[in-house]
């Protein structure tokens, strides 16, 4: 039998039927639902007089439109569209008998945080959600990707999808990361090297010592941004860290089922001689803290670097892109990254709103204050359970004493779909995943960074190398 990649194994184990043209009917083990991309899917079921094929294979939670300030019920949501979408999710899940972690449930939160922490996401599964950052769940060795609303309906009705197999890509990062360099820096550095189209048509497996050493939450950060590298799927092989992370979670297998599951998961890794269509290798020890300066995640630099000069770019198309980005971002060519001012700070999103992210940011902020020039600094937990754990550890007090606002769970300022928005012309140090024009608010200027780098920028009022602050504290 020929050697297989992890992606090959996950794909092959879920093929129901394969056609001569290469398309295949794939079985989907789990679907996660939220309020934005599910209403039309449920309406499609009603119009066709269908019921979900497997009710227990679906889990819903509102996240995109949920206010992060204190409120008592769905009816208190001020924006009428947001309120209707959340109310509609409540009504649809109730009608079709689907489990929902709704407003007021401590388990409510960002769908890509909730799935793994509840054990809903398991190694070896196929998992979809009507959200492009579903690749996050690949950190647990699951074949996970985003789908459109019509496909959400297909999965509800049939538990299957028609797919074409992707190519295999390996991003191998060896060596040891420097202190102060985080998983977010790793994935931004990868995107900076291969570009936002580097993974087009591929499922990316992240391998090498850096990812073996990385925590599961760190792997989630990396897989979360596989889509920003052009790939729908990001994967990390299952190891003992994966098994320990899943063990004991509410939806994880129990007793004999657990033993059988762990035995089945042992092969969820690429075979030694497996073929990858594309291989990228990097030295993790050379990765520096990253800051995006432009309007695409590939427009990124080391914190001690400079904004590029389009005059030095031989490719006219790239030069034009740099000029447009500099104009939108209000930056000058050759400007030092550390000279870029920071008006707002956002620590949160499905990329960086887990407990480890908050511990790292709080370690930077402890005993320090947010600069007076920073107009607003937000910390938004990825779920009610993350919020509760952070408060039990006293992290909320560190953030509040530093001058941050400690909020309730939700997608928040990652995207301009709720009350948390970045004003026009303002620069934001953000731990989210996208920085295109208007992503956080019309005219807003987003700089993608790690939680530590966001915390350091909040204190300084501009971008700084967090490693310098770490040295001061030691």
From Swiss-Prot:
PROSITE patterns: ACONITASE_2. SUPFAM superfamilies: Aconitase iron-sulfur domain. Pathway: Amino-acid biosynthesis; L-leucine biosynthesis; L-leucine from 3-methyl-2-oxobutanoate: step 2/4. Keywords: 4Fe-4S, Amino-acid biosynthesis, Branched-chain amino acid biosynthesis, Iron, Iron-sulfur, Leucine biosynthesis, Lyase, Metal-binding. One of its GO terms (biological process) is L-leucine biosynthetic process. The keyword Cytoplasm does not apply. [4Fe-4S] cluster binds at residues 350, 411, 414. PANTHER family: 3-ISOPROPYLMALATE DEHYDRATASE, HOMOACONITASE, MITOCHONDRIAL-RELATED. NCBIfam families: leuC, PRK05478.1, PRK12466.1. This is 3-isopropylmalate dehydratase large subunit.
């Amino acid at each position: 039998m020929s050697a297989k990649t992890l992606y090959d194994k996950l794909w092959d184990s879920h093929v129901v039927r394969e056609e001569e043209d290469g398309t295949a009917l794939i079985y989907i083990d789990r679907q996660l639902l939220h309020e934005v991309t599910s209403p039309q899917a449920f309406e499609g079921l009603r119009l066709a007089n269908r019921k979900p094929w497997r009710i227990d294979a679906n889990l819903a939670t509102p996240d995109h439109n949920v206010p992060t300030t204190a409120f008592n019920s769905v009816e208190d949501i001020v924006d009428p569209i947001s309120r209707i979408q959340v109310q509609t999710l409540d009504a649809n899940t109730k009608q079709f008998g689907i489990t929902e972690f709704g407003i007021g449930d401590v388990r409510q939160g960002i769908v890509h945080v909730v799935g793994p922490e509840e054990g809903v996401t398991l190694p070896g599964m196929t998992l979809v959600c009507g959200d492009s950052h579903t690749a996050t769940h690949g950190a647990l060795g699951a074949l996970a990707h985003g789908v459109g609303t019509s496909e959400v309906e297909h999965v509800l009705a049939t538990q299957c999808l028609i797919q074409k197999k992707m190519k295999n890509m390996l991003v191998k990062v060896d060596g040891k990361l420097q202190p102060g360099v985080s998983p977010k820096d790793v994935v931004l550095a990868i995107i900076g090297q291969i570009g936002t189209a580097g993974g087009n048509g591929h499922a990316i497996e992240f391998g090498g010592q850096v990812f073996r050493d990385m925590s599961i939450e760190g792997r989630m950060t990396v897989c979360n941004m596989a889509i920003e590298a052009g790939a729908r799927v990001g994967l990390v092989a299952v190891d003992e860290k994966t098994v320990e992370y899943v063990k004991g979670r509410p939806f994880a297998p129990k007793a004999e089922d657990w033993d059988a599951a762990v035995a089945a998961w042992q092969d969820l890794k690429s075979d030694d001689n497996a073929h990858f269509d594309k291989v990228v290798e990097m030295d993790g020890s050379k990765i520096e803290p990253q800051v995006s300066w432009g309007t695409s995640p590939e427009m990124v630099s080391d914190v001690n670097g400079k904004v590029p000069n389009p005059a030095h770019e031989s490719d006219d198309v790239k030069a034009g892109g740099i000029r447009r980005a500099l104009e939108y971002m209000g930056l000058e060519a050759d400007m030092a990254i550390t000279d870029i001012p920071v008006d707002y700070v956002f620590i949160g999103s499905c990329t960086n709103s887990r407990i480890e992210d908050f511990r790292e940011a709080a370690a930077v902020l402890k005993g320090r204050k947010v600069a007076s020039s920073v107009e607003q600094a937000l910390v938004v937990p990825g779920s009610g359970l993350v919020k509760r754990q952070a408060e039990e550890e006293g992290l909320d007090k560190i953030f509040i004493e530093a001058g941050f606002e400690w909020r309730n769970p939700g997608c928040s300022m990652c995207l301009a779909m709720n009350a948390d928005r970045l004003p026009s012309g303002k620069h934001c140090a953000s731990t989210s995943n996208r920085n295109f024009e208007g992503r956080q608010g019309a005219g807003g200027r987003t700089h993608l960074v790690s939680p530590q780098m966001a915390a350091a920028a909040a204190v300084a009022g501009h971008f700084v190398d967090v490693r310098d602050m770490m040295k001061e504290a030691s």
